[in-house]
Amino acid sequence: MSKFPTISEILSGKVAVGEEVAVRGWVRTRRDSKAGLSFLAVYDGSCFDPIQAIINNDLSNYQDEVLRLTAGCSVIVTGVIVESPAEGQAVELQAKSVEVVGWVEDPDTYPMAAKRHSIEYLREVAHLRPRTNLIGAVARVRHCLAQAIHRFFHEQGFYWVATPLITASDTEGAGEMFRVSTLDLENLPRGEDGKVDFSQDFFGRESFLTVSGQLNGETYACALSKVYTFGPTFRAENSNTTRHLAEFWMVEPEFAFATLADNAKLAEDMLKYVFRAVLEERKDDLKFFEKHIDNTVISRLENFINSDFAQIDYTDAIEVLLKSGKNFEFPVEWGIDLSSEHERFLAEEYFKSPVVVKNYPKDIKAFYMRLNDDGKTVAAMDVLAPGIGEIIGGSQREERLEVLDKRMVEMGLNPEDYWWYRDLRRYGTVPHSGFGLGFERLIVYVTGLQNIREVIPFPRAPRNANF
């Protein structure tokens, strides 16, 4: 074992009692006893719990430095691991020396002083908030989920593909995109029609930040069979809500020779895999969320893992909602996009389990979703989870060129703008499917937090791009 083990390694028993180590971290709290001892709670972020260091007053720098330590000071505490007589901790560190690496300039004005801070306040000091129990736990859970996603797809034979962040394509056809340009805003070049001449821009045409890696992912799925993307995406929606971000991460698998049923099975397997991983690897953080944020966090994940996914056609789901007797805020009729209240009723009250709603009306779904034989619906699906509603959206992709072209025209898109996407249907077309998982929504579900801005390090939202 290294002379500098992490606190996680020490507390998990990987360091033997009696071994001398040096712990590097930051002071959470200092407590002094009348017996001439000081107790330092030191954390390094490797796990939720700090380690307690016992400092005797015979250390040479005890009076001048140890007694001045406050929350946030960085230290290297060298000592021996001993069994702890106190409840709640198996071992502690009997210090032989304390080296102060960095002081907190003014403890009275330190933004992360040892007290409870509101979540709203923490957003104002996003550069310091990972030092709190809450955001530190979120960061570790986020890492665990990301690693589990990569492991799952690797084990399933999927290849990770890096899709571009700068694009000329609007995957959703919604137009809510951030433009990328190097043109001088004070002196825009214009054509004879008075419109901005983007041929003089950096890329020689209009370009945007991507809203999805899906279309690019499909190109590789039609060559490598099974691929996935995992990266940032951007939406210029002017939505200042607890559910929306302008910059967020998406997980988007695409696989060839796959039907909508295959897609639903992959989504179920992936969610259960990552939930098992976080329950096994981050129980310490989940217990914190269970105690302080949402007391159903752990049981909800366990119930999800042990539940069989229900499946229902959109048309039948509308019937269920109409017959429910519920007075929904948004009226129910065939052709609407299900709102959050509709989704949660289906998952939480009707099925009491995760549910896949499939075969939605074509007019409320994207152009690339495969048209069903009825001509009215597409082979789309949403995975609804108790406690949050939609967590995954996907579809079987339209592999027939003539149908794809017709759908594009219906939705006001120019097929020629998607010439490369159409080529996939011209050269060895194949049925294929995929879905999108909003990574931050997954973290919200796992942690029980109510605002999506708490689960990404530096949230980007309307009129908010600090740090």
Curated annotation (Swiss-Prot):
Keywords: Aminoacyl-tRNA synthetase, ATP-binding, Cytoplasm, Ligase, Nucleotide-binding, Protein biosynthesis. Disulfide bonds: none annotated. Its EC number is 6.1.1.22. Signal peptide: none annotated. GO terms for molecular function: asparagine-tRNA ligase activity; ATP binding; nucleic acid binding. It catalyses: tRNA(Asn) + L-asparagine + ATP = L-asparaginyl-tRNA(Asn) + AMP + diphosphate + H(+). PROSITE patterns: AA_TRNA_LIGASE_II. HAMAP family: Asn_tRNA_synth. Homodimer. This is Asparagine--tRNA ligase. It comes from Glaesserella parasuis serovar 5 (strain SH0165) (Haemophilus parasuis). The lineage of its organism: Bacteria, Pseudomonadati, Pseudomonadota, Gammaproteobacteria, Pasteurellales.
